[in-house]
Amino acid sequence: MVLFGSMQAVSNVAPPVELERSRAVAIMRRTDPKLACETVEALLAGGMQAIEVTFNSPGAVDMLRAIDQAFGARVLLGAGTVLDADEAEAALDNGARFIVSPHTDADLVASLARRGVACIPGALSATEVLAAWRAGASVVKLFPAGSVGVGYLKDLRGPLTDIPLLPTGGVTLDNAEAFIAAGAWGLGLGSALVDPRLVSERRFDELAERASVFVRIAARAHRAA
């Protein structure tokens, strides 16, 4: 007699080497396409390796393609805010090497995992985190991390010790070190790093310096692993 049902497990795809090493993702959300390549250059100068272009950015597909053509293997390019299979396919066709979502679509995660594509789905509760991991996630994005805080991540890490968590949404210079100390696998960095004002005012030296600070903080997660 079967007492408990079970979902067939999907093997988790390892994070790309660049992300495993750097433990940080720079998120370009609604960045001016005309300034995209300069923004990427500044992030690379600051030591960032993984850069995510969100799919709700104007001209996201064209931006992915332009960055891929301009930088090639110099950047680990990903697509974020991917909501369905069509968007994931378009992203992969235009240079993305990993997929990030604000939610967990188990079918999409499993489909990408079976193809060997790294996927970082979003989750908040313990139930969602476990579902994302069992679907085949490479890393689980804890979102929105800033709203629940460092203590929440630490509490999740208690029962879910072996699931890598990437706090995203509200990660800043004020709390980044605390997230790492609480057991975060790495950091998802939005406007606290890719500040729209720095980009629009072409203050790329400041952007590079800010990136270097976050890179040093995130590196502590790799050393602690």
Give the residues covered by each predicted segment.
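Glycine-rich phosphate-binding active-site loops on the catalytic face of alpha/beta enzymes
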Residues: 102-108, 142-149, 184-203
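Conserved beta-strand positions in the central sheet of alpha/beta enzyme cores
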Residues: 52, 100, 120, 139-141, ...
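Conserved N-terminal beta1-alpha1 strand-loop-helix module at the mouth
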Residues: 2-97, 104, 114, 162, ...
